[in-house]
Amino acid sequence: MTTLRLLISDSYDPWFNLAVEECIFRQMPATQRVLFLWRNADTVVIGRAQNPWKECNTRRMEEDNVRLARRSSGGGAVFHDLGNTCFTFMAGKPEYDKTISTAIVLKALNSLGVNAEASGRNDLVVKTREGDRKVSGSAYRETKDRGFHHGTLLLNADLSRLANYLNPDKKKLQAKGITSVRGRVANLVELMPGITHEQICDAIREAFFEHYSERVEAEIISPDKTPDLPNFAETFARQSSWEWNFGQAPAFSHLLDERFTWGGVELHFDVERGHITRTQVFTDSLNPAPLEALAARLQGCVYRAETLKQECDALVVDFPEQETELRELSHWIAQAVR
């Protein structure tokens, strides 16, 4: 019986691909070695312990229809588009060893004429006249009896967009989440013009087979029909949920301040698990009552722009004479927390 399994995803949906990865990892026999090859369309993928409001330009992501996906491994935030090739290696313990999977990727790159090397704990770099340039980043996850190593290879990614979505607005935000480290990066196409996703996948697959002296047929995973993986529907629902992608953020505080023609406003939010646990309001407005009422209404609310806007708009019923000010405040809050 073969000990290898090779899966290739036809989907560009990050929630689908991460759900497939999670299901395979949970259910694989401890004696199996798995290679999963995939890629995502326009997505910011954050680490398990990260705060999306701190790491990402969430407003620009929303405007550009860029998805947010929280993975189950640690590490920092990365931007994925179809110029990235993603790989996942899985194995049971004690065989699981990220140095083996790293060596397989390095061998695959070398077979394509790219002389890369491991750098630090997570990166693969190539040496250029401008210095070391990162072409791959990785993250890892281990349980009691198994582990996985997943990462991306920058093939022909739009690096300008990477900077757009991973450089957040200068929000007055204090958080305990892990901060992503930005590094000098390079696309493999700069080093090997014409290189394709298919070539990289073929090279990784061949290096994988060669290392284990065994070959298997690839299983194509498609969104056209539900994958034959136990609990996939439930795993996908969780992976695609706001509660997982945003609500799992570490506790943080957010300060918003603005000056309107009718007065200055400071809002202090304490947020835990994506819900507001405390709101403090400071203002020099001649009529602070609507703002005080807003602070009370927001207790326990989900920290989402549309929710905060709805709560603010609802105050017009109680304070009709301040409708203009409340609409202005509502619009500002919705923009500020995105």
Curated annotation (Swiss-Prot):
Top-rank taxon: Bacteria
Residues engaged in binding (R)-lipoate: K134
InterPro entries reported for this sequence: aa-tRNA-synth_II/BPL/LPL, BPL_LPL_catalytic, Lipoate_ligase_A, Lipoate_protein_ligase_C, LipoylTrfase_LipoateP_Ligase
UniProt keyword Ligase, yes or no: yes
One GO term of the biological process aspect: protein modification process
Boundaries of every BPL/LPL catalytic domain copy: 29-216
UniProt GO cellular component terms: cytosol
GO MF term list: ATP binding; lipoate-protein ligase activity; lipoyltransferase activity
Compartment annotation: Cytoplasm
Note: In the transfer reaction, the free carboxyl group of lipoic acid is attached via an amide linkage to the epsilon-amino group of a specific lysine residue of lipoyl domains of lipoate-dependent enzymes.
Function: Catalyzes both the ATP-dependent activation of exogenously supplied lipoate to lipoyl-AMP and the transfer of the activated lipoyl onto the lipoyl domains of lipoate-dependent enzymes.
UniProt similarity note: Belongs to the LplA family.
Classification via NCBIfam families: lipoyltrans
Subunit structure: Monomer.
PANTHER family in the cross-refs: LIPOATE-PROTEIN LIGASE (PTHR12561), LIPOYLTRANSFERASE 1, MITOCHONDRIAL (PTHR12561:SF3)
The protein's name in its UniProt record: Lipoate-protein ligase A
Organism: Enterobacter sp. (strain 638)
